[in-house]
Design a protein with these regions (language model features):
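Generic structural signal for well-ordered alpha-helices
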Residues: 25-26, 66-70, 94-98, 129-136, ...
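N-terminal pre-domain/capping segments
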Residues: 1-108, 178, 276-282
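H/E-rich (His + Asp/Glu) clusters that bind or coordinate divalent metals
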Residues: 235, 242-243, 253-257
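Tryptophan-centric aromatic hotspots in well-structured domains and transmembrane helices
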Residues: 9-11, 25, 33, 84, ...
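A short, acidic, flexible beta-alpha connecting loop/helix-capping segment that sits on the rim
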Residues: 255-267
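Active-site beta-loop-alpha junctions enriched in small/polar residues
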Residues: 8-12, 39-41, 85-88, 114-116, ...
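Active-site acidic/histidine proton-transfer and metal-coordination neighborhood
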Residues: 79, 84-178, 268
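Acidic/histidine-rich catalytic cores of soluble enzymes
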Residues: 36, 139-236
């Protein structure tokens, strides 16, 4: 079984201080997770406005950036499976990013998509693929591998035949760029996540797992319900088929990430419920 991990972004509301962070990481470990995926902007202090904006977007990052994450993950007995960053930071100083990743004992640096960026423009996507190749080559020279993490924006069509993700797959060099696939976001975007995973094959090094469904009790006003993320095995995604594909290509880690709609509004309770689904694959 690959390393079972949780993305740090899921934990923003329960990392308010050192003691709370210790308790959260201990609960993760006790639930059966062996790893954590760190976000560059959550392991360093960030400004109040950034925290405010991410909270307003429904994805609070919390105040954990001032904590000693090297000490926290070591004390919890967790493996750092990757470090999330942005392409701009890589282009400015790839060595610094690589050194930070290696200081946590991980070989993977992950680009989490582009902001204020037109994924529907074909020329822009060709350029992005070239930039990723260059950044990946710079990281490889430092002994670190670059992965690209998708959301749903990569499903935009750049022409009648291809989507943005097609260009990334076809024009990035596997020597320098591979992928962390998020099946939730492609499912949310209306795509066949399994087919894309099969197409990625062994270029999928890490897998972000989540489920999707409806959390409701009692009667509904209309027959159309809003769907959102759910604990693993409680939604409607065919996770068993996705897991079989991920295991068949030898992914290094299966990483839980959800941003909201947690049971009892608790990310810790949510990851504990999801851990029960993952236990069948231990």
């Amino acid at each position: 079984m690959p390393t079972k991990a949780v993305q740090q972004f899921m934990l923003g509301t329960v990392l308010g201080n050192e003691n709370e962070a210790r308790q959260t990481l201990a609960a993760m470990k006790a639930a059966g997770y062996d790893g954590i995926e760190l976000c560059g902007f959550m392991i360093h202090p960030i400004g109040f406005m950034v925290r405010l904006l991410t909270k307003a977007a429904g994805m609070p990052v919390g105040k954990g950036g001032s904590l000693d994450w090297h000490a926290l993950v070591k004390e919890a007995g967790l493996q750092v499976v990757s470090l999330h960053t942005d392409l701009g930071s890589l282009e400015r100083d790839a060595k610094a990013v690589a050194d930070e990743a290696k200081s946590f004992g991980t070989k993977y640096v992950v680009i989490t998509g582009m902001y204020r960026f037109d994924y529907g423009d074909e020329a822009t996507m060709h350029d992005l693929a070239a930039r990723l190749n260059k950044a990946g080559a710079a990281l490889k020279a430092e002994g670190v591998e670059l992965l690209y993490h998708n959301h749903n924006c990569e499903l935009r069509h750049v022409n009648a035949e291809k989507r943005a993700y097609d260009i990334l797959l076809e024009e990035t060099d596997p020597q320098f760029v591979n992928f962390e696939f998020d099946s939730y976001w492609f499912t949310e975007g209306g795509a066949n996540a399994l087919a894309w995973m099969q197409r990625l094959g062994t270029r999928m090094k890490l897998w972000h797992i989540n489920d999707r469904g409806t959390r409701i009790s009692g009667s509904a006003v209309t027959p159309i319900l809003k769907t959102d993320s759910m604990e693993l095995g409680t939604g409607n995604m065919d996770l068993d088929s996705l897991m079989a594909q991920a295991l068949s290509v030898g992914v290094d880690a299966v990483i839980l990430e959800s941003h909201r709609n947690w049971v009892d509004n608790s990310p810790v309770k949510s990851l504990q419920v999801s851990a029960e689904y993952l236990k069948q694959y231990t």
